[in-house]
């Protein structure tokens, strides 16, 4: 007895990838999940004020804030996995907006860091060479010449005597103000002053 088999018509998938599959591979899904996990970790690592500016839905914001609060290693790991799970519920547009905002934040940080390094190099040049002040004043004619000379002289003196770097830090602030850099980087100035402690 022969059996008749019924042939079903093949329906073509709406979208087919390069390999002929109609859905993403497991490897592709894993890569995407890992990317979202990394993005979530980047959000958790952001400074508090930068985190407030991120375009996040409330559920993700709550999960990220909770991950920042947890200090236990295993608890934090689990919470970060939860952040990744919440991120998988976001639309592509929401994820793209988050990536754009994070890239912009990283760009701002790089520019600010480069600016602080320039100020530190300028300070070192001013302390090492008297001609550097003339060049600095040529580039920044609105700078207070007398204050600059006084700070340089006092910073050199305190370095020779091994005193705390008060004028060293004030010179940093003077350069920042004279060159038109906005304030608010006192911590960086303090760190730069601490470097001086090690050298002295």
From Swiss-Prot:
Composition skew (Basic and acidic residues), residue ranges: 12-25
Coiled coil: none
UniProt GO BP: assembly of large subunit precursor of preribosome
Keyword Transmembrane helix among record annotations: no
HAMAP family given in the database record: DarP (MF_00765)
Subcellular location: Cytoplasm
Record-level Gene Ontology MF annotations: ribosome binding; rRNA binding
Pfam families, per database record: DarP
InterPro entries listed in its UniProt record: DarP (IPR006839), DarP_sf (IPR023153)
Acidic residues biased stretches: 184-200
PANTHER family the UniProt entry points to: UPF0307 PROTEIN YJGA (PTHR38101:SF1)
Broad class of the protein's primary localization: cytoplasm
Name of the protein: Dual-action ribosomal maturation protein DarP
GO cellular component, one term: cytosol
Family, as annotated: Belongs to the DarP family.
Known function: Member of a network of 50S ribosomal subunit biogenesis factors which assembles along the 30S-50S interface, preventing incorrect 23S rRNA structures from forming. Promotes peptidyl transferase center (PTC) maturation.
Domain of life: Bacteria
Span list, region Disordered: 1-25, 177-200
Keywords tagged on the record: Cytoplasm, Ribosome biogenesis, RNA-binding, rRNA-binding
């Amino acid at each position: 007895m022969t059996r008749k088999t019924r042939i079903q018509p093949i329906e073509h998938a709406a979208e087919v990838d390069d390999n002929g599959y109609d859905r993403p591979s497991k490897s592709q899904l894993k890569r995407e999940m890992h990317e979202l996990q990394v993005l979530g970790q980047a959000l958790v690592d952001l400074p508090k004020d930068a985190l407030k500016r991120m375009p996040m839905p409330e559920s993700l914001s709550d999960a990220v804030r909770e991950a920042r609060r947890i200090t236990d290693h295993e608890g934090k790991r689990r919470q970060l996995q939860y952040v990744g799970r919440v991120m998988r519920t976001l639309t592509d547009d929401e994820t793209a907006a988050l990536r754009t905002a994070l890239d912009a934040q990283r760009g701002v940080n790089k520019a600010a860091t480069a600016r602080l390094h320039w100020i530190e190099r300028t300070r070192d040049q001013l302390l090492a060479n008297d001609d550097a002040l003339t060049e600095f004043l040529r580039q920044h004619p609105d700078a207070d010449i007398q204050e600059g000379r006084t700070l340089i002289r006092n910073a050199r003196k305190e370095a020779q005597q091994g005193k705390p770097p008060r004028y060293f830090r004030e010179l940093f602030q003077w350069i920042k103000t004279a060159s038109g850099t906005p304030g608010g980087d006192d911590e960086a100035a303090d760190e730069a002053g601490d470097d001086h402690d090690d050298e002295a």
